Amino acid sequence: MDEFHRCGKEDSFWQQCFLYPLFFQEDLYAISHDHYLDVSSSSRPMEHLSSNDQLSFLTVKRLIGQIRQQNNSIVLFVNCDPNPLADRKKSFYSESVLEALTLVLEVPFSIWSKYSVEGMNESKSFRSIHSIFPFLEDKFPHSNSILDARIPYYIHPEILVRTFRRWIRDAPSLHPLRSVLYEYRNSPDNLQRSIIVVPRVNTRFFLFLWNYYVCECESILFSRLKRSSHSRSLTHGSLPQRTHFHRKIKHIIIFSRRNSLKSIWSLKDPKIHYVRYGERPIIAIKGAHLLVKKCRYYLLIFRQFYFHLWSEPYRVCSHQLSKNCSSSPGYFLRVRMNPILVRTKMLDELFIADLITDEIDPIVPIVPIIGLLATEKFCDISGRPISKLSWTSLTDDDILDRFDQIWRNLFHYYSGSFDRDGLYRIKYILSLSCAKTLACKHKSTIRVVRKELGPELFKKSFSKEREFYSLRFSSKAAARSQRERIWHSDIPQINPLANSWQKIQDLKIENLFDQ
């Protein structure tokens, strides 16, 4: 494998590399066996690991011999060594062979993704959720419309195999992949008769399929957008106030010297910006309504003809930023004008000018969050707190920790909003629900619980925002911070409540299109 990486700099080597002989190397299955045991030991206790979870090279050689026969290539999902102690649908050796298949396919994919990203100087790769928030502040104010799309999950297995053939010319190495995909497609549990490519499946094989599928979609989409655009990419540089500098070079006029006539080439950047969080890409566009409709139509046709998928119209929605829209993960978005007073002194004269800039204003969706809290039995539909009966069997510390975790996630995720008053209503619901849960556990009232526990009741919980402001701001700065947006950098993933709320919004959009 190191030889593949060393030779990957050659343009055609990674396309013509022969991967099929790697399937018959015993070292590959030893590596996959170790990785599988690491994942299994982290998800299962040690007492559930039996002696059958040991690698036998005799069984591996038997599997390799069966893989050599084309008629028995479907052996990847056959119970070769069943383990009665583990309640799993696939055998231990089937998982090991599947891990080995993933390791082989990851070699050319890693080389291709590495050198394709290095060759794209004008584009930047967003690899973390933390890059979404600078994108909202830096890119969105320059756009007047956004396209909220959803990557389709269901795809035919033969389409995946054909896309692999574009950069792997070793056809025999794709036979095991085709066998795995069709076996999964024909399984009794799969009612859609297609491959479900989702990023939440915690297996290395499906995570690899998801990364490859998304990378293929984005690479083809970016190349088409680059060809359709007649303007070259303009970088704004790294300045403290990149927003204003970006506005200055928005329109550049170049006069042609070759023609005596006054031919003008306008480098008018169409302002198409792209970011993706999970399976939801966002495309911010600055242009007329006709341009937005063309981009939306292009995305639908692109999916239909390139991946041979029928894409429902509700999977690509367009919104205007002048109105409230639910396009960002868990936020209502709107653009507001922010006036800035600029004083310029030249010699003895002082000039005062008002500079008006557009600024994105994410709004906390209070009503949907209350609805989700009501679904999770923290309050009723009107927002009245109730006790969490399913948590009464836990200890007091566990109850406080769970409520504290929910509030900390909500506060950190929505701290970038200007108007954070609605968050304190959520805090009131969670704190009173916590008190009622403790009172229900001890079979008493809220007053008795507060009297017995005293100030220790909420000393540990619901105090993260006070610690944050006291550690980082003085009194004046803390007051100013209420008018400024602060993005926390300890958000590991998108808030689960935001995902649930986004699913509800998607169902509403689907119902509108059905009507």
Swiss-Prot record:
One of its GO terms (cellular component) is chloroplast. The keyword Transmembrane helix does not apply. It comes from the Eukaryota. It is found in: Plastid, Chloroplast. Pfam families: Intron_maturas2 (PF01348), MatK_N (PF01824). Its main location: plastid. Transmembrane segments: none annotated. Keywords: Chloroplast, mRNA processing, Plastid, RNA-binding, tRNA processing. One of its GO terms (molecular function) is RNA binding. The keyword tRNA processing applies. One of its GO terms (biological process) is mRNA processing. InterPro entries: Domain_X, Maturase_MatK, Maturase_MatK_N. Usually encoded in the trnK tRNA gene intron. Probably assists in splicing its own and other chloroplast group II introns. Belongs to the intron maturase 2 family. MatK subfamily. PANTHER family: MATURASE K. This is Maturase K. It comes from Pinus leiophylla (Chihuahua pine). The gene is matK.
